[in-house]
Amino acid sequence: MISSTGSSIPMDTLRISPVDICGRPHILRQSSADGPRRRPSLLLFGYAMQLRIKLYDLILAFANALDQVHPALTGHHRRVGFLLDRLAERLGLPSEERERLFLAGIMHDVGVIPLKTSAEDLVFERERYLHPQAGCLFLQNCPTLAEEAERVRFHHMYWEKACDRGLAAREGSLINIADRVDVDLRAKNDFREAVEGADRRVCERRPGIYSPDHIEAMQDILHDEETLNDLAGAHIRLPAFVRRRYGNQILTPQETIRFSTLFGHIIDSCSPFTATHSTGVAHMAVALGRLTGMGQDDLDTLFVAGMLHDIGKLGIPLALLEKPGQLTDEEFPKVKRHADLSRLWLDAVPGFERVSVWGGGHHERLDGKGYPLGLKGEEIPLPSRIMAIADVFTALTEDRPYRKGMTPPEALRIVKGMVKQGHLDGDLSRLLCDHADELDAVRASSQAEARRGFQALHDACAEPDERLRD
């Protein structure tokens, strides 16, 4: 195997795809609507470098994306995390517990995404235990977040049940009071009036919902002028606060991959029609990239970009994403905005510059008629071209509200047509056709595995954890 720098890569170092692509590696020419072009420089390729991402940079960026799911959630996860840190400080909890609570707090509602139907359901869900259970099951798939997952499981449990169920349940109940207070703080436009209302409601709730110690600590927070000023600007000040409080833990490339896989699954869970889309795109892009001679570090980055390429869809109304008919002239720009959001949110993570360009460029086209930037020809780096083909082929084979999924031969015909129209890279298209069976097997097997995971999540939520019921 020939790497992007020309060195040999042993097959046993190829870690990502469950199906290895065998056969002679291909060195691609760059092509465009106007014909063959020279291969881009490594500056466009992005250099071969390991992913070195800070844990909290990644977590905060994803919390920001979660906060865009609905206007009712804007800033919610970040403020809950901030409130939890201040609560833990006043309660005298050890630093390890404070950090665990903060992490759980800024991701506590990840389970609402596959269950959401309306703004009311997001905040005042009738079955309070369902989205905590879904969130816990999501987070358990990332070993780094195993303990936080248990806190998320119990974050709607009342104190009267949590107090004798262990540390995870007690800390989950602490998330509950921070969660509810933030909802109350957003109930009115006037922040000071909202603070007074939140303070009053903390005491008015019936005995047993919150711990008396938690109530006292929360009232201290709601009467502390400095804390209130910080809370009012928590979405602005939080990154600096986190770096000061919790340090700069660097994730290994494989940990970054696991986090990105988790986030990709959460993104895809927005709709049953896209429940395995990012998984298929990521694995197919890596398999195709491997055939071009990309090195392992670049393949790792390509995989992460594939898992996160549609993160911007969290900011698009589900009704538009699942519309069965043709989008109107007013609706199409709103859907296209997901690519802008993907680039914006990914670019906010230091070290994700290539992930942002490669993943956020999956709708760019060689003739300059793509989006979000309208890049043309050599302005589009090879990994972005790979992502575009992987995205198109995977999407064509999936069922959508407006059509049934195509067979691989039908999808290949569409890809070839897009090459003729000047949209997609001709060399990559030929490589796809030459290895169609192997590449489609990678896509199909990875999506089948992801589908089994979503089915397990669905089944688990259909049989709720009795510990979470009132």
Predicted features, each with a name:
Residues 16-18, 31-33:
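Intrinsic disorder/low-complexity segments
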Residues 12-13, 27:
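Periodic, rod-like helical contexts
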Residues 25, 34-36:
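Intrinsic, low-complexity polybasic segments
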Residues 37-48:
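Short, Lys/Arg-enriched N-terminal segments with co-localized hydrophobic residues
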Residues 50-470:
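Histidine- and acidic-residue-rich, metal-dependent catalytic cores
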Residues 1-8, 15-17:
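Low-acidity, Ser/Thr- and Arg-rich intrinsically disordered low-complexity segments
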